[in-house]
Amino acid sequence: AGYAAYLVGGGVRDLLLGKHPKDFDVATDASPEEVRALFSNCRLIGRRFRLAHVHFGREIIEVATFRGHHENGEGEGVVENGMILRDNVYGTVEEDAMRRDFTVNALYYNIADFSVVDYTGGLQDLKQHKLRLIGDPMVRFKEDPVRMLRAIRFAAKLEFQLHETIDRLIAEQGKLLANVPAARLFDEILKLFLSGHGVSAYHLLKEHDLLQYLFPLTSPLLKDDDYSDRFISQALANTDTRIQQDKPVTPAFLFAALLWLPVRQQAGLLQQQGMTPLQAMQVAGDDITREQVSYVTLPKRFSFPMREIWINQVRLEMRRGKRALRLLQQPRFRASYDFLLLRNQAGESLQELCDWWTAFQEQSDEQQRQMINQLNKGQGQGKKRRRRSRKKNSARKSSAS
């Protein structure tokens, strides 16, 4: 059709690093509308960045038009306080390279002659395992503060060193994240922690003081080499392992772990005020969730099971009667049980409870009833039957006569 097109971005970067690319993006001088005219299986998405998605069976190829500078490009762009709100300004391939975030993501594979085109020094940075922003880092972070989180994510994923200027500015300019929509921050958190490199990302976020802008209720409770730090680190280590083993992971469990510290603290305070453990956990879970979503959106399809995981931590201790059997049938039982094991791993004294539930799941119906009966007997032995005083009974009889 006469248009220029290049493979670009993470796919090219990963190939050069000897990694298996997750997907390939295409950059072209064709406008989104021209791409749509070429492919019947194409749909246009996005307002902030207009993109073409070309569908091939289950595969989607993302096609972006070369971006230009806002001063002289063609198209539509909106900038407010240095932050780009809409970026549909088109230009040349050289301008497109300068508009990308990191040098290692601005490598273009020319399909025509099988060459790699590098306008920003990305090949050299790849060799040195260094993550460097294109252009003035302060300007680039103001244009899009999420670039700070992307820098953390790529440094964790690629095991690259942050360029010293980025390293310093991220810690200084984290407050810019307050300008990012809460829904977008939710998406970025999933990319940070559900990519198989969550532990590294967590430590980098802590090191650069960014957690306070994502989880302001959790951040003040974190202390090095303490239960709090061990709990989050262990939760993310377990998640990383599941991802590496191609096992499913859910944002509900992730957020349950990331918000457990303030929920646990709040529930403890509410119990001191006279609430039952179950009431305290329900109220604490609702309060912390309500406050957290003002910073980072959490869709109800995840917030509801997240709160259920917390409430079930209390129910897991209430095993007598038919409660244990009812809990075992609950859809969130497995996640709640795994959460209990996680708490024990991090240092809470829950080994006996963990062992009981581990054994209980593996027993037959009859053996499960026997295990519950043992608990009921233990409860009965703990409570002595009160007897009336004989003297008082005798006195009552005398007065009656």
Predicted regions and their residues:
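Catalytic cores of the polymerase beta-like nucleotidyltransferase superfamily
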Residues: A1-S401
